[in-house]
Amino acid sequence: MQSLQVLAIVALVVATIIAIVVWTIVFIEYRKILRQRKIDRLINRITERAEDSGNESDGDQEELSALVERGHLAPWDVDDL
C-alpha cells in the first residue's frame, strides 16, 4: 500500500508539472495572437489613412515599428520575392 501512495503522489506531481507547461505555452501563444491583432489593426489604420490623405501616418508607423521591434516597416511593400 505504501508504494501505491508514493506512485500516486509522483503521478500527481508529474501531472501538475505537465499542466503548468501546457498552460504556459497556451498563455504565450495567446499573447502572440493579441500582439498580431494589434499589428493588423495598425496596418489597416495606416493603409486607410494613406488612401484617404495620400500620405501615411508617421505616428502609426512608429508605433508599428515599436511593436515589431524593427526599423521602418511597410509590410504591404514586399519586394523580396
Curated annotation (Swiss-Prot):
Cytoplasmic side: 29-81
Keyword Cell membrane in record: no
Topology within the bilayer: Single-pass type I membrane protein
Region of interest (Disordered), residue spans: 50-81
Gene Ontology biological process terms in this record: receptor catabolic process; symbiont-mediated suppression of host innate immune response; symbiont-mediated suppression of host type I interferon-mediated signaling pathway; symbiont-mediated-mediated suppression of host tetherin activity; viral release from host cell
Compartments in which it is found: Host membrane
Residue ranges of the TM segments: 8-28
PTM: Phosphorylated by host CK2. This phosphorylation is necessary for interaction with human BTRC and degradation of CD4.
UniProt GO cellular component terms: host cell membrane; membrane
UniProt GO MF annotations: CD4 receptor binding; monoatomic cation channel activity
Modified sites of kind Phosphoserine: 53, 57
Extracellular side: 1-7
Note: HIV-1 lineages are divided in three main groups, M (for Major), O (for Outlier), and N (for New, or Non-M, Non-O). The vast majority of strains found worldwide belong to the group M. Group O seems to be endemic to and largely confined to Cameroon and neighboring countries in West Central Africa, where these viruses represent a small minority of HIV-1 strains. The group N is represented by a limited number of isolates from Cameroonian persons. The group M is further subdivided in 9 clades or subtypes (A to D, F to H, J and K).
Described function: Enhances virion budding by targeting host CD4 and Tetherin/BST2 to proteasome degradation. Degradation of CD4 prevents any unwanted premature interactions between viral Env and its host receptor CD4 in the endoplasmic reticulum. Degradation of antiretroviral protein Tetherin/BST2 is important for virion budding, as BST2 tethers new viral particles to the host cell membrane. Mechanistically, Vpu bridges either CD4 or BST2 to BTRC, a substrate recognition subunit of the Skp1/Cullin/F-box protein E3 ubiquitin ligase, induces their ubiquitination and subsequent proteasomal degradation.
Assembly description: Homopentamer. Interacts with host CD4 and BRTC; these interactions induce proteasomal degradation of CD4. Interacts with host BST2; this interaction leads to the degradation of host BST2. Interacts with host FBXW11. Interacts with host AP1M1; this interaction plays a role in the mistrafficking and subsequent degradation of host BST2. Interacts with host RANBP2; this interaction allows Vpu to down-regulate host BLM sumoylation.
Domain notes: The N-terminus and transmembrane domains are required for self-oligomerization and proper virion budding, whereas the cytoplasmic domain is required for CD4 degradation. The cytoplasmic domain is composed of 2 amphipathic alpha helix that form a U-shape.
Name of the protein this chain belongs to: Protein Vpu
Organism: Human immunodeficiency virus type 1 group M subtype B (isolate YU-2) (HIV-1)
